[in-house]
Structure formats: structure tokens, C-alpha cells
Amino acid sequence: MDVNKVLQELKARPGFTDHVGMMLVHNGVVRGWSRKDHAPVSSITVSHDQAKMDAICHEMEQRPGIFAIVAQANEGDLQPGDDLLLLVVAGDIRENVKATFAELLDRIKSEAVIKQEHGPEA
């Protein structure tokens, strides 16, 4: 998961300069605490459904003004601070990109990524 590489690859695509005025990036990392109750987290186990992620991205790339979407997720046992999820939405104007980005993030997190947190005693 290399944010700079992904951005460079998007910029190199034919039509980029004709269709893109903004890119939004989400680089999710493992927290050292649980969102639910702020209990300490020493690691998490992550799995994802790549086919589902790809389908969501393809669906959302059909929206007005969206040029491309990239979604990558790490799997396995991860520690606090490790990269977990990388999302990039490239499109024409902020109104189109922001709305798509917000829904993309929510859908991928709820439909395609499964996380199990482990506390210090695990």
C-alpha cells in the first residue's frame, strides 16, 4: 500500500488532466484503542472481500464526474499504526468527489472489510 505510487499511477492514466480536478485519499490505520469503548487494542485480525470491494468501486465509478477509484486493504494480523485501508477517489469537482468518497468509505467498511480487535490480554 503506497499512497504516492497510487497517485502517480492515477495521474499517468490517459484522460486524467481532462477529467480530474481533485483526489481524496483515505489512509486508514489501526488504532491503539477500540472505537466502541476506547479499550486498549494490541492488534487486530483483518480480512476483506476483494471481489466486493471491486464491485463497489466499479459501481461508484459510474457516477457523474468520477474518473477513477482505487481501494486496497491489508489482511492478517496488524498492529496499531499499521496501514489498514487505502481509498482514492479521483474526479472533476469537489461536490461529486466528496459525496462519492463518503459513501465509498462507509460501504467498503460495512460490506467488504471484517476486523476483529484483540486487547492486551490476547
Q: What residue spans do the PLM features occupy?
A:
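N-terminal, polar/charged subdomain of small-to-medium soluble alpha/beta proteins
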Residues: 1-84, 90-122
